[in-house]
C-alpha cells in the first residue's frame, strides 16, 4: 500500500511537472503578441484596439475593406514615424517592439514587403543588400560576409524567386515593372531571412504567373521557426500561400478570426455580412 501511494505521488508529481514544462514551452512559442494597440496619424485614430498573437511557424492572413487599418498596422509594427502609438503593447520574441527604432526591429528579424516598393536611383541592388545583410550580421555579433561569400548567397537566394541576375546590377527598383518590384521585395526577404515577414498587399497589381512566383518564394522560405502576416484583399493569393489563421480587420479592430475557410466566404459574400454581425 505504501509503495502504491508513493507511486501515485510520483506519477502526480511527474504529471504536474510535465504540465509546467508544456506551459513554459507554449508560452515561448509566441513570436508576436499585440495587446490593445491604438495608433493615430495626426488627430485621426486608425487602430482602435488591435489584439493579435502569432506563434512560431504560423501564417496569418489579414483581410478587410479599404481604410480598415491594415497597412497602418504593418507600418506601426515596423516603426513608421508618421504614426503615433497612443495605447497598448507589441512584444516581439520577448522584447518590447514599440521601444525599438525601425532599424533595430529589422535587425531583430522583422521585415516589411511594401505595397508600393520605392525606387532608389544610384544605389545598386548588390550594394544595398550587402550593406543590409552585413548590418544585421553585425547586430547579431557575426562577422561580415566576404565578397565571394555574399555573391554565393545572393545567387542562391535569387534562384528561390526566379530573379534574373541582371536585376542585382541595377539600381534598387529603378525602371522595374510592378511585378519585378514585388519579386525583388521577396528576394530581399530571402537575403535577410527574417523571423516575421509582413507582406502588405504583395499581390496588388500582379498577374497570375507573377503571383505564383512570389508565393512560391514565400513558401520555400517558410519554416517551423519563421512566421508571416499576409495582408491581402484577395482569396486567390491565399490559395497559394496557405494561412493557418484568417483575420478580418474593420474600423481599426480585428472583428473576426477563423481558419482559411473565412477567406473563401469573404470572396463569395464580401464584407457586408461581417459589418452586420459587428453592428456597424
What are these language model-derived features?
Residues 32-34, 47:
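Conserved structural motif at the start of ABC-family nucleotide-binding domains
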Residues 54-56:
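Conserved hydrophobic segment flanking the Walker A/P-loop of ABC-type ATPase nucleotide-binding domains
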Residues 63-65:
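The feature captures the beta-strand-to-loop junction immediately N-terminal to the Walker
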Residues 89-105, 173:
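ABC ATPase NBD Q-loop/coupling interface
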Residues 112-116, 122-138, 150-153:
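Q-loop/switch helix immediately C-terminal to the Walker
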Residues 189-190:
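ABC ATPase C-loop
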Residues 198-202, 209:
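Walker B catalytic motif
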Residues 245, 249, 253-276:
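Conserved beta-strand-loop-alpha-helix hinge in the C-terminal portion
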